């Protein structure tokens, strides 16, 4: 019975180690992992070119991405080749990295509403979700509650 239990536990550990990592692909083809952002706050925004509220909030996200604080990623809901996505990024003046795909176990589900923004804490866990257009006061509240004076990156 002891050997069977040890064998079972060993198999579980092996399978746990095989679990797919949370990864992303940027519009320029660069591959990254969620764990690359460990130790810092991460804001992940889902947008689409046809979504008017998404386009209105892009300047706020660009500004947030340039400020000291969280890393910011924009995930395109539009399915298009990388070259077209890069052209859209230039056309819309998106200065934050644009993601073409997310794979593996992310700490949130695919949004049902656009725009949707997720705040991921330095441990890789979901801290906040915002459905609908972001406003400056939403970001100010996150700054105060998450990555501002309370630590974080």
Predicted regions, residues:
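Short active-site neighborhood of thiol/selenol oxidoreductases, capturing the structured segment around
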Residues: 34-55
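Sec-dependent bacterial lipoprotein signal peptides
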Residues: 1-18
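Thiol-/selenol-based redox modules, centered on thioredoxin-like
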Residues: 116, 120-153
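Short, internal strand/loop/helix patches
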Residues: 88-122
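N-terminal "domain-start" segment that seeds a small globular fold
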Residues: 15-35
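Hydrophobic beta-strand anchors of alpha/beta hydrolase catalytic cores
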Residues: 43-44, 72, 117
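Structural microenvironment flanking redox-active thiols in thiol-disulfide oxidoreductases
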Residues: 56-92, 103-105
């Amino acid at each position: 019975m002891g050997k069977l239990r040890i064998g079972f536990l060993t198999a579980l550990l092996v399978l746990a180690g095989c679990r797919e990592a949370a990864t992303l692909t940027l519009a320029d083809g660069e591959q990254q992992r969620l764990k690359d952002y460990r130790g810092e706050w991460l804001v992940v925004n889902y947008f689409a070119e046809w979504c008017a509220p998404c386009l209105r909030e892009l300047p706020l996200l660009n500004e947030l991405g340039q400020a000291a604080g969280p890393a910011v990623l924009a995930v395109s809901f539009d399915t298009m080749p990388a070259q077209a996505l890069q052209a859209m990024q230039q056309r819309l003046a998106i200065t934050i990295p644009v993601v073409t795909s997310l794979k593996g176990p992310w700490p949130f589900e695919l949004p049902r509403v656009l725009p949707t923004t997720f705040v991921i804490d330095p441990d890789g866990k979901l801290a906040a979700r915002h459905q609908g257009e972001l406003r400056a006061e939403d970001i100010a509240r996150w700054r105060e509650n998450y990555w501002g004076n309370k630590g974080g990156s």
